[in-house]
């Protein structure tokens, strides 16, 4: 099992990522959420400079906020700084886009972006299209490629794997089809993880791939309750609640009504019955109307994934905490990870919500060193 760290991209995160490296953490893939955190690529460049072997990449970026040729350039430049240590994590950008008040990218946009980046990473020409839009009246079809591959500007010699993040059935299947790996959000509970893995397998088989060869990474939060604390304690909810709300909101928003094909009336039929109601209760976790459409996201996504919101208290039940996070005794958490490994998971990636160094120390002492 590999161990990783994630966080909203923070320009000073190299300090605690470098602290975590000798304690067994080998990957760092922060969120590329532009209005919430620092710039992802400046953050990752600093991490590469201050670590020895840490593999890094956006966890995740999206094709709407950053066009494919620019993403490919950013990744190839990271690959020059840390040869063989760059991983491209990409998906629809639910949080990054919604934090600006706009919808996420479409599934086909992700497919196209991955195809373009993969060709560019190989030093090949890639087709690239723009328009029509506000500034360009007609559609334009062009070809792009890296023009100075031998100049030390970027590294195309060391392979850059592409991990596709997914929550709903369509993206899970696309991830299995086109990804070198798959990033899952909060897929900890057995039935929930099995639901994800089954859809990943469908996509892999569609592409003629062996699903067992896909690298499966699960992002989550971690907390060992102190004496006297329960899963309903405020201390526990502050420690993992922000991740529970975020990850399960992403899952709920990724589903549509099987009859109307609309998100607004989704019932979550695709989800396992034992967690369906709890997960779908998060569909409106970030929905308030008093500020209006033009500004409501400015309130909704403040402190996103960082601070506890009291309005989420009824949603963050013990069942949902167990479904999406590693919360419990050290032995329970290790047993859960062993079970996840048997289901096909290759890496557990932790987001520190409280003090990063303390979280790293606790996870190392209670999990990594005894696994």
Label for each model-derived stretch:
Residues 20-22, 44-55, 75-86, 176, ...:
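Acidic (Asp/Glu)-rich catalytic clusters
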Residues 41-61, 65, 113-116, 120, ...:
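Alpha-helix-loop-beta-strand connector modules within alpha/beta enzyme cores
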Residues 1-59, 160, 353:
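N-terminal beta1-alpha1-beta2 module of alpha/beta enzyme domains
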Residues 1-11, 61-69, 156-167, 222-225, ...:
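Active-site mouth loops of central-metabolism enzymes
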Residues 108-152, 193-339:
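An alpha-helical appendage that flanks or caps ligand/catalytic pockets
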């Amino acid at each position: 099992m590999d161990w990783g760290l994630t966080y909203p991209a923070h320009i000073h995160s190299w300090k605690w990522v470098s602290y975590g490296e000798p304690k067994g953490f080998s990957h760092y893939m922060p969120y590329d959420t532009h209005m919430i955190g620092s710039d992802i690529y400046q953050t990752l460049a600093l991490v590469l400079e201050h670590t020895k072997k840490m593999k890094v990449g956006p966890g995740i970026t999206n094709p709407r906020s950053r066009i494919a040729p620019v993403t490919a350039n950013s990744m190839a430049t990271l690959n020059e700084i840390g040869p063989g240590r760059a991983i491209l994590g990409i998906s629809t950008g639910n949080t990054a886009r919604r934090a600006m008040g706009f919808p996420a990218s479409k599934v086909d946009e992700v497919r196209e972006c991955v195809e373009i980046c993969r060709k560019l990473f190989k030093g090949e020409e890639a087709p690239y299209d723009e328009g029509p839009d506000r500034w360009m009246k007609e559609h334009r079809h062009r070809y792009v490629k890296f023009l100075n591959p031998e100049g030390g500007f970027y590294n195309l010699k060391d392979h850059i794997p592409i991990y596709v993040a997914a929550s709903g059935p369509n993206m899970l299947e696309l991830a299995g089809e086109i990804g070198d790996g798959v990033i899952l959000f909060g897929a900890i509970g057995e039935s929930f993880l099995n639901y994800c893995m089954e859809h990943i397998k469908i996509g892999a088989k569609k592409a003629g791939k062996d699903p067992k060869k896909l690298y499966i990474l699960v992002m989550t939060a971690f907390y060992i309750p102190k004496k006297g604390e329960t899963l309903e304690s405020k201390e526990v909810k502050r420690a993992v609640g922000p991740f529970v709300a975020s990850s399960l909101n992403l899952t709920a928003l990724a589903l549509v009504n099987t009859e109307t094909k609309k998100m607004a009336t989704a019932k979550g039929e695709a989800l396992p019955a034992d967690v369906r109601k709890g997960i779908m209760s998060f569909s409106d976790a970030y929905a308030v109307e008093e500020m209006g459409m033009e500004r409501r996201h400015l309130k909704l996504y403040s402190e996103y994934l960082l601070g506890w919101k009291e309005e989420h208290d009824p949603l963050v039940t013990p069942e949902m905490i167990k479904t999406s996070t590693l919360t419990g005794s050290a032995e329970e958490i290790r047993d859960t990870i062993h079970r996840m490994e048997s289901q096909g998971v290759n890496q557990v990636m932790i987001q520190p919500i409280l003090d990063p160094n303390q979280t790293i120390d606790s996870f190392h002492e209670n999990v990594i060193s005894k696994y």
